[in-house]
């Protein structure tokens, strides 16, 4: 079966499961297997004949059978899922916001793992859209998830994949957050309106604001921030001026300007978090050690909290 057909089949299974749950009121379902709350589970899947894996975490709750929102976390290159989770504190955020957390591992070995986000034209690359759809189906066989509140968050290569998911699995996600990652190719004109938060440093040396630089390998391509924002503003119907907010804590060499187009009047909330003099880094309140030559890290905001707050207010209409 061609990749596109397999992907449509997996997405169709998601739709059938969603419809079945709507018949139960769309809110509750008994957990299919024994799953302990507050525990992280490692899961292995075979997708396209490849061994793939992810972990998922269910925060403690006094209503374990209730359907809950699902947050997909896509790690950057050189920082696999568990390492990245510890770095940005996603399990603590899942506890706070009540998200089921699922974090897939990219293809590769050791730390050298990445996702196929459309940056390289290689027919032998894995289909990570199919992997994502298969992973969601697998999670749905274990616990009750709220199909109207499936979110994706990623950094760098993982952030690029969140954009790709809006293209390859349209209508699946209720919102995305991409930090230091723009799409590998321009967004399609028929892309569905989707709440999006883009976070990018103006002096990012790895994925520059203006797109690939002379230091970017020739076989890698990705979009610049300005054109990506313009595309999302068109898709999401952002015609009014943005609401602006400045964040500036002294001592970190950066400032943050948050550009926000609320919905309504836009079709979907759209946010650009512009990190002035910021590098290829995840903003935090306390500086953290990271790879060299990645630029300044902003300590003006807690990006994990800001991203989860943005996602938690998004919900898509399910087709009945």
Where are these regions (language model features)?
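A domain-start/cap signature at the N-terminus of enzymes
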Residues: 2-4, 10-70, 82, 96, ...
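Short substrate-entry loop that stabilizes the transition state in hydrolases
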Residues: 63-111, 185-186, 206
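Cap/lid segment of the alpha/beta-hydrolase catalytic domain
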Residues: 105-127
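Alpha/beta-hydrolase active-site loop
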Residues: 121-142
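Alpha/beta-hydrolase fold nucleophile elbow
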Residues: 145-155
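Short beta-strand/loop motif that positions the catalytic acidic residue
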Residues: 198-200
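C-terminal catalytic histidine-bearing segment of alpha/beta-hydrolase fold enzymes
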Residues: 223-224, 233-320
């Amino acid at each position: 079966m061609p990749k596109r057909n397999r992907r449509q089949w997996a997405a169709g299974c998601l739709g059938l499961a969603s419809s079945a749950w709507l018949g139960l009121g769309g809110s509750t379902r008994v957990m299919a297997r024994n799953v302990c709350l507050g525990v992280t589970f490692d899961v292995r899947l075979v997708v396209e004949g490849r061994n793939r894996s992810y972990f998922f975490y269910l925060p403690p709750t006094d209503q374990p059978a209730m359907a809950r929102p699902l947050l997909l976390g896509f790690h950057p290159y050189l920082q696999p899922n568990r390492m990245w989770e510890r770095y940005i504190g996603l399990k603590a955020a899942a506890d706070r916001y009540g998200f089921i957390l699922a974090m897939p591992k990219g293809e590769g070995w050791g730390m050298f793992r990445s996702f196929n986000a459309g940056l390289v034209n290689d027919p032998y690359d894995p289909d990570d859209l199919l992997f994502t759809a298969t992973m969601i189906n697998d999670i749905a066989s274990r616990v009750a998830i709220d199909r109207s509140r499936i979110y994706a968050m990623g950094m760098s290569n993982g952030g690029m994949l969140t954009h790709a998911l809006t293209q390859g699995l349209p209508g699946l996600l209720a919102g995305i957050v991409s930090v230091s990652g723009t799409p590998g190719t321009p967004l399609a004109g028929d892309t569905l309106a989707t709440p999006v938060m883009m976070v990018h440093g103006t002096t990012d040396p790895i994925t520059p604001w203006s797109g690939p630089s002379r230091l970017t390998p020739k076989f890698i391509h990705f979009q610049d921030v300005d054109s990506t924002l313009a595309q999302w503003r068109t898709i999401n119907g952002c015609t009014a001026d943005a609401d602006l907010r400045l964040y500036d804590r002294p001592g970190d060499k950066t400032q943050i300007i948050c550009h926000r187009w609320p919905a309504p009047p836009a079709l979907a909330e759209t946010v650009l978090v512009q990190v002035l003099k910021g590098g290829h880094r995840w903003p935090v309140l306390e500086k953290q050690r990271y790879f060299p030559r990645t630029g300044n890290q902003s300590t003006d905001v807690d990006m994990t909290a800001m991203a989860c707050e943005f996602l938690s207010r998004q919900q898509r209409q399910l087709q009945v």
